[in-house]
Structure formats: structure tokens, C-alpha cells
Amino acid sequence: MASGKEIRGKIKSVENTKKITKAMEMVAASKMRKAQDRMHAARPYSDKIRNIAANLSQANPEYTHPFLVKSDASKTVGFIIVTTDKGLCGGMNTNSLRIVTTKLRELEAEGKKVEAVAIGNKGLGFLNRIGARVVSHAVQIGDTPHLDKLIGPVKVMLDAYQDGKLDAVYVVYTKFINTMKQEPMMEQLLPLAVDKLKADEDSLAWDYIYEPDAQTVIDELLVRYVEALIFQAVAENLASEQSARMVAMKSASDNAGSVISELKLVYNKTRQAAITKELSEIVAGAAAV
């Protein structure tokens, strides 16, 4: 059995760890609320662009943008994989990368190649370990994502699809459901689903005038729409990260509390045993006299 001094040292060590995890839990809770606000604020922008693009597409059926055309010519599929830059957020990244691994095996069985863009250090490290072809990446996004940091890597994928080098583009991220639940998602980004670009009846009743022309506006809007979808995925992933980290740190703090209680019980038993032994020795000594 360990000595009382050793047990006290362990208790002190676990208490210090608990202070750290508790502080990280509080920081993550604060960041989570801000991340949720950014996530909700990004949705109206993408919804409005989608409505305008849908109106244009249905009002000009004779023009078909490359983002709406499905192709099977290149036998290459693109992935935009959104993960975190840091760890200590439970199994969030593991769950996302697990569905990526499953999809990669399916594509390999079909004889298709894969090109990937990594957003986040964890995804980049994973892709490098498995030997995937990473065409671009963005790391150190921070707690406040900016589209400026994402446009470069995203444009690589969009240009490749527009040039016919990719058959499809998927985005993988963790969707924020609530504080206790986050779900890994894999969604087809390109070609755009036609059902997502259906205009409301009210918007079709208006006859808009577009300058310089409808085709130019469609070209620009669809690119902005796809960028908005990716930004939304990053915002969702960030909210999920902070939520998962808060839950993980709370669990760590609770576990540390349990360990401290157990160590204190062991310490008290050890101390009681030492006292009992000393008393026995005193009694034995007195009897001998």
C-alpha cells in the first residue's frame, strides 16, 4: 500500500488537473454560445442566395451552369473535409473521419480516384497518414472563421469540377444538433441538387431585371452559394467542436472528482491503519513492561 505522503501527492496532482479541465469547460461554454450565434447568423445569407439563384435558374431554363451538370467522365471524386485544429473534443473528429474512410473504400472498389481539401489540422494529418492526395488545405482557422481563409482551397475544388476534372464533390463536417448531440455529415456539394434550387411561388411571380445579364449573375451567384454552404459547414463544425469540448471537459472534471474521493478514502484508510499499528505497538510495549 502506498504511503500517506504519496497518496497526498496524487490527490494534489488530480486536483490541479481538475482545475484545468474545469477552466477549459467554462471557456468552451463561452465560445460555444458565440459559435452558435455565428452559425445561426450565416444561414439567412445562404438561404437568400439560394432563393435568388433558384429564381434565375427557373426563369432561364435554357442555360445550364456546370455546377448543375452531372458527369462521370473523370472517375475522380473530390472531398472537402472539415475537422478541428485542436483535440480534446471527444470522438468528434474520429466519427467524421470514420465515414470518410468508409466512403473512400467504396470509391476504391469502384475504381475511382480521390482528391481532397482539408480544413483543419486533424483532417490534414489523417489524410497525410493514409496517403490521400491533398490538393489544398486551410488550417488555424481560429474561433472566428473568415471566408477569406477558405476561398483559396475551396476554389481549387470548384475550378477542378468546372473543368471536368471531378465527377462530384462532397463536404464532410460535424453538424450541430444541440449541446449534447453532434452528428457527422457527408453531403454532396456538387453537382448541386436540383430540388435545393426550387424557387418559391411568390418569387417567381416577380419579373426581375438582371444586369449585365441573367447568365452572368447565375455564374456569380452559384459560386457564392457553394462558398456559403462550405462556410456554413465550417460554422456548424466550430459550434460542434466547442460543444463537444465542453461536454468532454465536464466529464473529465467529474471523473477527476471521483478519483479524488477514492484517493481520499484510501488515504484515510492508510492513516487509520498507521494509527492502529502505533497504538498496538504502544499497548504491546506497555504489556511487556
Swiss-Prot record:
Domain of life according to the entry: Bacteria
Membrane topology label: Peripheral membrane protein
Pfam families (alphabetical): ATP-synt
A Gene Ontology molecular function term of the record: proton-transporting ATP synthase activity, rotational mechanism
Subcellular location: Cell inner membrane
UniProt record, GO biological process: proton motive force-driven plasma membrane ATP synthesis
SUPFAM superfamilies linked to this entry: ATP synthase (F1-ATPase), gamma subunit
Similarity comment: Belongs to the ATPase gamma chain family.
Role this protein plays: Produces ATP from ADP in the presence of a proton gradient across the membrane. The gamma chain is believed to be important in regulating ATPase activity and the flow of protons through the CF(0) complex.
Complex and partners: F-type ATPases have 2 components, CF(1) - the catalytic core - and CF(0) - the membrane proton channel. CF(1) has five subunits: alpha(3), beta(3), gamma(1), delta(1), epsilon(1). CF(0) has three main subunits: a, b and c.
The protein's name in its UniProt record: ATP synthase gamma chain
